[in-house]
Design a protein with these regions (language model features):
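Cell-wall polysaccharide-cleaving catalytic domain and substrate-binding groove, primarily
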Residues: 1-143
Length: 143
């Protein structure tokens, strides 16, 4: 039996995210959130990502089970919580001041590959030394 995949509007989820109480705690810019959302896409029904992990909303994996559907509001709340979690972990492994665009790209990268892999990466080692062009060049190695 074929299941129906229910997608959601990235724009609607981002608008709802801006209304979440913890939104003001984010260091990622609205453009950075849009980057994450555009790259991840949005689905209200759970699906298995390319790594075989159950996922819903905008790249949310914690506690996702094969059955059950979420709302766009839940997707927005999960996005804000997930990005805050990524930011918290990056503050430990890459505690350097960086341009906003570099920060947004780092958060997006870490959101996708996981903070463990990101923090062990050559990309982060370049960021720690504030070598932005070399850090940027590392992104291609992960595609």
């Amino acid at each position: 039996m074929k299941s129906i995949v229910k997608k959601c509007s990235v724009a609607a989820v981002l608008a709802l995210a801006a209304l979440m109480p913890d939104f003001r705690l984010l260091n990622t810019s609205p453009g950075g959130l849009a980057l994450i959302a555009d790259l991840e896409g949005c689905r209200l029904t759970p699906y298995q990502c390319s790594a075989g992990v159950w996922t819903s909303g905008i790249g949310h994996t914690a506690g996702v089970v094969p059955k059950g559907e979420i709302t766009e509001r839940q997707a927005a709340a999960n996005l804000v919580a997930d990005v805050l979690n990524v930011e918290k972990r990056l503050a430990v492994c890459a505690p350097v001041k960086m341009p906003q665009q570099v920060y947004d790209a780092l958060v997006s990268f870490s959101f996708n590959v996981g903070t463990g892999a990101a923090c062990r990466s050559t990309l982060v080692s370049f960021i720690k030394r504030q070598r932005w062009p070399q850090a940027c060049d590392q992104l291609i190695r992960w595609v």
